[in-house]
Amino acid sequence: QLAQGSHPAQQRLIFEELVAHQLSLLARRAYIQQIQAPALPSSKVLAKQLLAGLPFKMTHAQKRVSKEIADDLKQNKPMLRLVQGDVGAGKTLVAGIAACHALEADWQVALMAPTEILAEQHYLNFKRWFEPLGLNVAWLSGKQKGKARSAAEAQIATGAAQLVIGTHALFQDNVKFAKLGLVIIDEQHRFGVRQRLALREKMAEQNAPLPHMLMMSATPIPRTLAMTAYADLDTSVIDELPPGRTPVTTVAIPDTRRTDIIDRVRHACITEGRQAYWVCTLIEESELLEAQAAEATWEELKLALPELNVGLVHGRMKPAEKQAV
């Protein structure tokens, strides 16, 4: 029983740990709900201008989730909401609409992603959406140095940067926000509770109102599990794909069938003319972690698929190198 984890004493300990985790999150939520946050009225102009410039319409699910967020933002207590939805469901647009409420009320918005590649993708999207509307979108990453870094930090500190996109660099002590009203975190499961509260605490140190917090995840989490693991969060689900979007199929295949997977990649790229992405946990091989490394996998796939052009992209590459790929 001990080896299988089924001993009554073990199960009791597990139960008590889960209860303690749940209670601590609920207590944290109750504490945060007593703290003042900026009440952000629904956007009357900016959201309409943003949607008018897009070549598509929002789905019913996007509208429903956007209303849930707007109802939270109207309150003078901090929003804590998790938005779930498959890849392609339109979470980024929902985040953009949420940003409109804060921006129109003259508050800053910070969007944080776990990797530089994902953060840069958001930066390009939000810059394309918001700069034509007269808003300044700033970029901040750990790799920025010298004058570029100082200029970005100065814009954030003075409020000249109304929308700030970045990575963990947004956590750093020397990054000061002038008037932060909304924090958006993508792939929130990549951040711990302590990490996702760090930006809030930055404002508490400045005796400023706590910003609202919106988290997004494409990882399918059953609602009951979300209620257990993220007891401090309200949950919204975008359960509808835009017209023309194919539902995502997720399949787990053991590494023993690696050659089968490579054959499927070959068929998809050559026969069907598609692109394939092979995502690895690490950049280089590690003696401490048993995980696939991007550089080793790239070499392997080049040998296994000589008829294909196999590219490599990772966070340590220079922007020009990534752009070339």
Residues covered by each model-derived region:
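Inter-lobe coupling/hinge segments of SF2-like helicase ATPases
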Residues: I35, R64-K67, K77-V325
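Generic surface-pattern signal
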Residues: A20, A52-P55, I270, P306
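Conserved pre-motif I regulatory segment
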Residues: I35-Q84
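Upstream accessory/linker segments immediately N-terminal to the RecA-like ATPase cores of bacterial MutS
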Residues: Q1-G53
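Generic, well-ordered alpha-helical scaffold segments in large soluble proteins
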Residues: H21, L25, Q49, G53, ...
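Generic alpha-helical structural element
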Residues: H7-Q11, A39, P55-M58, L214, ...
